C-alpha cells in the first residue's frame, strides 16, 4: 500500500498516477531478444484481462463469473479500484504455450465467457504488460485465487468455427466508435507546433519529395555503399 488516499491518487495528473502504480510488472510470456513488441512474441503462457468497465457494486458478480470458468485463475484489483468503480485484473494460466497468433482469439474468447463488455478494448494486445498489484492506503484490495486445472487453450480455440477468422472474434461493444473518435482527434499535421508544423505548412507530400529527392538519393547511396563521402 502507498501513503496517499484513493481520493488523492485520483486527483493527480496521469503522469504521477503512472509513476505510483509502476511497481514492476509481468507479461506471462517470452520475447525474442527480450524485446517487448508484438513482432517478437515467442509465446504466451498466461491469458490476462483488464476489466475496467464494471458497473458499481458488481465486484462479487465478476468473481462468481471467473469462479464459474472451472479453471485455474487469479483475480486482483488494480490501482483505481473502488466499490463504486470496480477495476479488476484476471489472470488465467494455459495448459500449453500459446503462439502469438493463438493468443488474441483465445483471450477474446475467455473475455466473452466472463463478459467482454467489461474489458478495456486494448487488453487483448499480445505484448501487453500488466503491473503487479498495488493500492492506496484506504483502498479496498481484492485478491482471489482459484486452484483448479489450467485452462485448455485448444478448448478455447475450439469454440470457434475457425479461430483464424477475425470476423468471428468477440469484440468490446463500441470499440470501433472509440477508435474512430481517437483517430479524429489526431492533430492535423499543418496545425502542429514548431518545426514540424512549419515544414508541413510549407510543403505538401509531393512538393517535399520533389524538393528533397536529390538529398534522399544521396542518403540512400551513402547507407548502401560503406565508403566515406566527401562533402564539398
Report each predicted region and the residues it spans.
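Short secondary-structure junctions and interdomain/linker hinges
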Residues: 20-23, 27, 73, 117, ...
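Modules that initiate DNA replication and primer synthesis
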Residues: 38-68, 79-116, 131, 136-138, ...
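Short coil/turn linker and secondary-structure boundary residues
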Residues: 4, 15, 54-57, 98, ...
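DNA replication initiation on ssDNA origins
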Residues: 1-46, 56-60
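Basic/polar, cationic surfaces and motifs that engage anionic cell-wall
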Residues: 119-180
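Short, glycine/charge-rich beta-strand/loop segments that flank catalytic centers
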Residues: 28-32, 78-80, 125-129
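Intrinsically disordered, low-complexity segments enriched in small/polar residues
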Residues: 22-27, 31, 37, 153-159, ...
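A short linear hydrophobic-aromatic micro-motif
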Residues: 71-77
Amino acid at each position: 500500500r502507498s501513503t496517499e488516499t484513493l481520493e488523492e491518487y485520483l486527483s493527480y495528473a496521469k503522469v504521477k498516477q503512472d509513476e505510483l502504480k509502476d511497481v514492476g510488472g509481468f507479461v506471462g510470456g517470452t520475447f525474442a531478444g527480450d524485446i517487448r513488441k508484438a513482432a517478437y512474441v515467442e509465446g504466451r503462457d498466461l491469458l490476462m484481462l483488464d476489466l475496467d468497465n464494471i458497473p458499481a457494486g458488481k465486484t462479487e458478480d465478476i468473481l462468481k463469473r471467473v469462479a464459474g470458468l472451472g479453471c485455474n485463475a487469479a483475480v486482483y484489483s488494480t490501482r483505481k479500484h473502488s466499490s463504486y468503480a470496480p477495476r479488476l485484473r484476471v489472470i488465467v494460466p494455459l495448459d500449453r504455450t500459446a503462439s502469438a497468433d493463438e493468443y488474441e482469439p483465445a483471450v477474446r474468447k475467455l473475455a466473452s465467457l466472463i463478459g467482454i463488455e467489461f474489458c478495456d478494448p486494448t487488453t487483448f494486445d499480445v505484448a501487453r504488460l500488466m503491473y503487479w498489484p498495488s493500492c492506496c492506503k484506504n483502498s479496498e484490495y481484492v485478491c482471489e485465487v482459484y486452484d483448479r486445472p489450467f485452462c485448455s487453450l485448444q478448448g478455447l480455440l475450439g469454440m470457434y468455427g475457425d479461430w483464424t477468422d477475425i470476423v468471428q472474434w468477440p469484440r468490446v461493444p463500441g470499440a470501433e466508435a472509440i477508435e474512430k473518435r481517437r483517430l479524429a482527434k489526431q492533430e492535423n499535421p499543418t496545425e502542429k507546433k514548431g518545426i514540424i508544423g512549419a515544414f508541413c505548412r510549407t510543403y505538401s507530400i509531393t512538393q517535399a519529395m520533389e524538393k528533397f529527392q536529390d538529398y534522399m538519393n544521396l542518403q540512400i547511396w551513402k547507407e548502401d555503399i560503406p565508403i566515406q563521402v566527401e562533402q564539398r
